[in-house]
């Protein structure tokens, strides 16, 4: 029996969970037959936890104890308050993930412990790690994080879009990504990606909200901008108007008894035309077109070389988007797969592939950033101590492992400082510093002592960095995700317990690597020795390496149970390579 690995689209506005079964992906429904879970969390009047539609419904009356669009804050140090308690964005996202997990378990009739989760292609390492942490807090082993446009392209590939170059235009509630994807011979390859992780349908809503506030101020002399409950009702009306204007030229916005001023009620009655609305959001659409051109340039393509345009994300239902894309590319964009569901469907396809199901595509993902370090060099023709030296260029296929050599600058130099940056600017200080460490105790040697800097980027965008003195083997290494992480292991455990307490007692989920009875341990001599060697490395391995060790051991055990000799041989070779890497 193939292991169930669910696919999750953890969205800014809505989230979905899907599974690959019966040779196709399907989005799972809750007990009321709903496929879409609003990404909203709240606490009811009696202190009960609300997730999804119930939380969204109370947002109008109780905005102070309801949280939405938490995805915008993923990877930040922000804290949010809910019912007198303080939570991180990871914890709020974990509540949503835990609800999705429950929906899947009820639908499938079996425990769900592993998931593929999607993120915007332009999410930073910090945001990707925060997503992984949210999954761990929710009791899920996140076996893969993939880009949302990649997942969507995979769904369309299943519809036999072979041998084409495709633009995936992904505009969700809070993020935008333009990805150029090549589909050929059953392989989905992301050539380039560019976007903005703070641009989406929420911005469209806020433009309508601003219009409504101005209308009330000018026509009725009332300012409700400092009244949370009134603002929540206005936001809900703005969202409804936006959706209505996708299919109609006008939207009527009405809210009775919105507020009271000097004892008199204020009623909102306003008609908004599509033309007015499109004028409000046109600058945002132009931003997305500019991002598309950056992605095209990175892929060394012109607009005429694009064969298909695929629309992803609920905000793409806005007619202006289709019109501007048609003007720019002289072709119609396609959106026949529900743009709200296709990302979750693609995640489920990837989950099925990882679990061993036969699917038609192999994902080749790329990094949306350049990763590098700083060194003495030149900038604009002048000596500069912080010249940016790229090591992993933007749009490199991942996973990737690259090294470069640097040299000490003084005789008997004892220490080197390594700074790791993310960005494209030739001035390292203009890029984002994502980690730093020192290598101390270098051997006494003349200037020019070689230091090898090694960067390994995995499929989840998590970076492992090491610096080694070539002549002695002296080495220091860091994992950037932990350097930027908002949690250490104890905090992860505490956060998971807090979320578990909110949900109440459930079946005891096993965290990855924990004991769960019969393990099906390999008994074949060479394989058993290899597995034992891997298990001995678990304590000293960094978290990402430890997770990969656990994954490969599990795959080996599963292949032995199923007598899958081909799969066993592949996993054995991968584990051998990983152990070799860890020992060098």
Where are these regions (language model features)?
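Oxyanion-binding/catalytic loops of NTP- or PPi-dependent enzymes
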Residues: 1-76, 80-86, 95, 102-584
């Amino acid at each position: 029996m193939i292991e169930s690995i669910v696919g999750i689209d953890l969205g800014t506005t809505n989230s979905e969970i899907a599974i690959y079964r019966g040779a196709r992906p399907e989005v799972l429904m809750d007990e009321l037959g709903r496929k879409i879970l609003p990404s909203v969390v709240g606490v009811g009047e009696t202190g009960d936890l609300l997730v999804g539609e119930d939380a969204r419904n109370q947002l109008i009356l109780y905005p102070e104890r309801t949280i939405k669009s938490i995805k915008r804050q993923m990877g930040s140090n922000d804290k949010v308050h809910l019912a007198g308690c303080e939570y991180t964005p990871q914890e709020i996202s974990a509540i949503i993930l835990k609800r999705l997990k429950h929906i899947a378990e009820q639908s499938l009739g079996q425990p769900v412990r592993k998931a593929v989760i999607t993120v915007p292609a332009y999410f930073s390492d910090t945001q990707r790690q925060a997503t992984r942490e949210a999954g761990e807090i929710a009791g899920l082993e996140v076996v893969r994080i993939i880009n949302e446009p990649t997942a969507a392209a995979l769904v369309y590939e299943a519809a036999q879009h072979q041998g084409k170059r495709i633009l995936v235009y992904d505009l969700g509630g809070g993020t935008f990504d333009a990805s150029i994807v090549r589909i050929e011979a059953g392989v989905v390859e992301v050539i380039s990606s560019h976007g903005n992780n703070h641009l989406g349908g929420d911005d469209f809503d806020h433009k309508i909200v601003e219009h409504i506030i101005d209308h009330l101020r000018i026509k009725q002399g009332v300012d409700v901008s400092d009244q949370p409950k009134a603002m929540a009702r206005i936001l809900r009306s703005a969202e409804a108007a936006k959706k209505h204007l996708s299919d109609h030229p006008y939207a009527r916005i009405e809210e009775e008894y919105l507020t009271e001023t000097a004892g008199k009620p204020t009623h909102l009655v306003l008609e908004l035309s599509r033309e007015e609305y499109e004028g409000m959001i046109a600058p945002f659409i132009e931003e997305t077109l500019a991002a598309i051109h950056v992605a095209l340039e990175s892929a060394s393509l012109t607009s005429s070389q694009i064969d298909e345009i695929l629309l992803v994300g609920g905000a793409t239902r806005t007619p202006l988007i289709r019109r501007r894309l048609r003007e720019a590319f002289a072709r119609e964009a396609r959106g026949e797969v529900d743009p709200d569901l296709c990302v979750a469907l693609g995640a489920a396809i990837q989950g099925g592939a990882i679990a061993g199901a036969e699917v038609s595509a192999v994902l080749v993902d790329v990094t949306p950033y350049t990763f590098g370090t700083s060194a003495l060099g030149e900038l604009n023709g002048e000596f500069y101590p912080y010249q940016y030296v790229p090591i992993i260029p933007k749009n490199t296929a991942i996973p990737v492992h690259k090294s470069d050599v640097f040299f000490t600058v003084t005789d008997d130099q004892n220490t080197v400082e390594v700074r790791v940056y993310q960005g494209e600017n030739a001035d390292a200080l203009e890029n984002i510093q994502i980690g730093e460490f020192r290598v101390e105790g270098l051997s006494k040697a003349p200037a020019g002592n070689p230091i090898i800097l090694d960067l390994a980027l995995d499929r989840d965008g998590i970076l492992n960095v090491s610096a080694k003195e070539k002549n002695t083997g002296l080495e220091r290494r860091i994992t950037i995700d932990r350097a930027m992480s908002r949690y250490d292991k104890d905090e992860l455990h505490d956060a998971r317990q807090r979320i578990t307490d909110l949900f109440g007692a459930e079946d005891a989920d096993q965290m990855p690597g924990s004991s769960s009875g019969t393990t099906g341990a390999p008994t074949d001599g060479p394989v058993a020795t290899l597995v034992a060697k891997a298990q001995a490395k678990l304590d000293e391995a960094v978290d990402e390496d430890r997770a990969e060790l656990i994954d490969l051991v599990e795959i080996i055990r599963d292949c032995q149970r199923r007598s899958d000799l081909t799969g066993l041989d592949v996993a054995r070779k991968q584990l051998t390579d990983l152990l070799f890497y860890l020992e060098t």
